[in-house]
C-alpha cells in the first residue's frame, strides 16, 4: 500500500511538472515566448538576476557596473536590466551601502547576496497570516524569521529542533534524542498558563506559550519536514500579528512557508548525507562488586543483615563464577556504541511567465541504538525511515487570474523491539549488573525469581512492532484581480484537505526466561513462550478540511498607502470517532501609511468554535488589536545621518483568544459504573456515574497583549538590531477551583477563572561584512522571560510561603535542604520528617514554621525564581569556495530536578540498580566530602522527598551545530555539465558546557539519551 501511494503521488507530481511547459506553449504562447526572450537576454549579458542564498529574489537592490557607471534597480522578481561584459565588476548596494562587488563572466547572470546582511534582510517582505506579506519598513508586528539555508545545516527532521537558538522569543527544550519522536504538534494552540511545557520530545515555547502552527497559510500539524523544502519559518508574537486568528491567537503563531518556483531556468539539486550518531550522557551503573558492596551497606543502614558474603564479593570482583555471580553491563550488551543515519533529497525548481514549480523528494533511513541477533529473520532494532514528497505549482492563467496547487505526501515507517524501546531502557536502568547472567548453561534466557525477566530477551526475543504513519495534503487556491473596478482590488479563494493515519503492526511475542539452580540442576520457568502476534491497530487517524475566501485592496495614492483585507474561513477537523471540531469566523486587517514614515494598523478576528455552548455569548468572540509604527530615520533631523540607516519604533496592543475547552465540556457526560443486585428476585443492573461536572457557561480563554519594539540598521547596513518589550496578561483561564469540597462527591467543573502574566524582553543583533573574497556574519538572539500566577482560586494557606498565587507559572514547591545530618546529637536538636526516624547521613530540612515537625507546612518555593534567559549565537564566514558556520545555544536561570531509578539507588524494594554517583554517599568515613545521602534499601521517604537537594542548575551552553563546506570552482564543474558541487561536513551536539554536568541539561531522568551526529554530505546542482 505504501509503495502504491508513493508511486501515485510521484506520478501526479511529475504530470504537474510536465504540464507547465506544455500548457504554456499551447494555451499561452505569448507568455512562453516572452520567457524565452527573457532567458536569451540573460544569456547575452544584458540582465541580472539577484537572489539570496535561499534562491529568493531580492527587490530594491541597486546594482552598478563600475566600468560603464550604469545603474539599475531589481524588480519584484529580482531582475535588473544592466549590460555587462566578461571582466566587468558589478557592485550591489542597499540604499547607499555597498553589499558586495563581484566580477562577471558572459555565462553568468545570477548574483547571490547574503540575507545575513541586515540591509538585504530588510528588503525581504515580512510574512503574515493567510499568505499575506508586508514591506519590512511598514510592519508594525513583533516577528522574527529564520530561512531555510540555516535550517539545512542541521541533519534533523524536526522543525522545533532546527529553529533552536535561531529565533528571538522562542525557547525550545529537547527532552528525548530519538529521531521521529518529536511529538505531534497539531494546528491548535495551547496556553501554558498555569502548567508546564508538556511532554513532547522537543517542546517549544513562544513567549511562554505553545504557538499555533500554520503551514503555507493553513493550520497544520508540525510533524516531519524536509528542511530543504522550507523557505522560511516566521514567528508572530504580538496581538496585531495574530488578531485575525481570533480564538486561536493568544499563544502566538509559527508560519512555515515552503519553497516555490521562480521565473528562472530549471534547477535540479541533489543532496546525499551520511552520519554516525552516538548516545550522550548514558547513565552509568555500578559493576557487580560495587553494587553488592553498597547493597550490603544500605541493608546495614536499615538494620538488615547483609545479603552478600565475603565469598560473594570476591567472586564478583575476580569474575571466577560468571554463572552464579554474574557481572553484566546491560547497556553495552543491548545497545550499540553508534548508529547510522542516511539522508537523501532531490529538488527541482523553475518556471516562466505562465507557471512556476517546485518539487522536492526526501528519504531518511536511520538505524537505532539496539543490537540485533542472527537468530531472527526480522529486524528488532528501533529504526526510522521516512519518505516525503512535496509539489508547489503556481499558475498565471491570464493577466487577471492566477492560482496554484500544493501537494504533499509523507510516509514514515518506524520499528521497535516488541517489548518497546523505552521499556527496555527502563529495564536497564532498573536492573543491576549481578541480577542474573544473560544465558543459562543450556542456552536459555536466564533470570531469577526476583526479576523474572531478561533484558537481552526483551531486546531480541520479543519480536517487533512496526509503526506506519501517513500524511497527505492538497491545497488549491485562485486569485482574481479587479483592476478594472479599482486598481489594487483582488479576491482570493482557497480550499485544503489533510488526512493523517498512524497504525501499528504487532509482530511481538512473549518469551520465557529460566532460573537455573546449580545444586539441583533444575530450571524454573518464568513467562511463556508465545507465538508471534500478527495484527494491526490504529493509533491515530484524522482528517480536516479548510476553506477561505478573502477580499483585499492594496494601493498607493501619492504619499498615502492603504492596504486592507477581510476574509471568512471555516476549519473542520475530525479525530478518530470523535465529533468534528469546527472553528469558523471572519477577520480583517487595515493598514495606512503616510510616505512610509508613519504607519497605523487595525486588525480583528470574530470567530468561534462548536465546542462552546450555542446559547449566550460563549461561542463567538471579538478580538481587536491596534498598532502603530514610526520610521524615525525618515525624519528631516536624521536624513543626513551617516551612521544611521534605518530606525523604526513600533508598538501594539490588543485582545486575543485561546480555544482550549476540551471535548464538549459544557455537556454533562456519564459512564457505566459497577453492577448492582436488587429486587425481590435479585437481578444485575449497571449503574451510571457522572464524569467531571459540566460547565454550561464555559467560553474561550483571553489575553491582553502589549508590545513595544525598536528596530534598525546602522554602520552602512552592516549591523541590525531589534529589541522588544512585552507584557501579556492571560485571563479567563480554564481550571478547577482550588477552594472546593469533596462533599458533592464529584470533581468540580472547569471554569474560566485563572489569571497569569508573562513579561519579558526579546532581542536580536546581526552583523555582516564583506571584505573582497572574505565575508563573515554574527547573529545573536535571545529572550528574558518571567511569569506570574495572578489568580487561581487557591485554598487559603496557613503560611505565606505556601502560596502558589504570586509565584511563577509551573513553579516547583518542596523542602529546603540544609545538608546532611552528621550525628545523632544534630538529629536530636533538629526538626524531623513526619513518619521517618532520621539517621546520620539523611537529608536535613529547614523547619520554616518552627513547630519541630517537617511536613507540607514547610514546603515553599524551590528552584530559580529569576527570569529565564535563553539565547543563541549564529556565526560563520565564506572565503572563496570555503564556508563555515556554527550555532551555539543555551539558557540561564534554569533548574533541573533529578529523581527516579536513574538517580536513587536500590529502588524496587532493593532490587534496583545503583549508580556511579552513589559512590559519593555519606558514610562516617566520608562525612566531610559526601555529596549524596546515606544508602537505603527501597524508598526512603525522607531522602527522596521533593527538595532543593535534588535540584541543580540547568544553565548550559551547547555547540548545537557546526558545518564546514567547500564549493568546487565553477570553471571545473561546468566542464562536466554541472552548475555546482559542494561537499560539506557538519556535527550536532558536539560540545556542551553545563553548570551541572553529571547529566545532560535537557535529557535526564531516564529519557531516551540525546545523540551526537557527525555528518558528511555532497550537494550537486544541475
Task: Give residue ranges: language-model regions.
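Cleavable N-terminal targeting peptides that direct proteins into the secretory/outer-membrane pathway or into
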Residues: 1-44, 86, 99
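Membrane-proximal, glycine/serine-rich, low-complexity loop/turn segments characteristic
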Residues: 24-41, 110, 120-124, 130-212, ...
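Structural motif
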Residues: 36-38, 43-58, 221
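Short Pro-Gly-centered beta-turn/loop motif in secreted/extracellular proteins
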Residues: 55-56, 81-88
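Short, acidic Ser/Thr/Gly-rich low-complexity loop/linker segments typical of extracellular
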Residues: 68-79
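A short, solvent-exposed loop/turn motif at the edges and junctions
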Residues: 89-105, 116-118
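Extracytoplasmic gating/loop element in the C-terminal half of outer-membrane beta-barrel translocons
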Residues: 307, 432-441, 457, 838-840, ...
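Extracellular/periplasmic, surface-exposed regions of secreted and cell-surface proteins
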Residues: 392, 396-401, 406-411, 417-421, ...
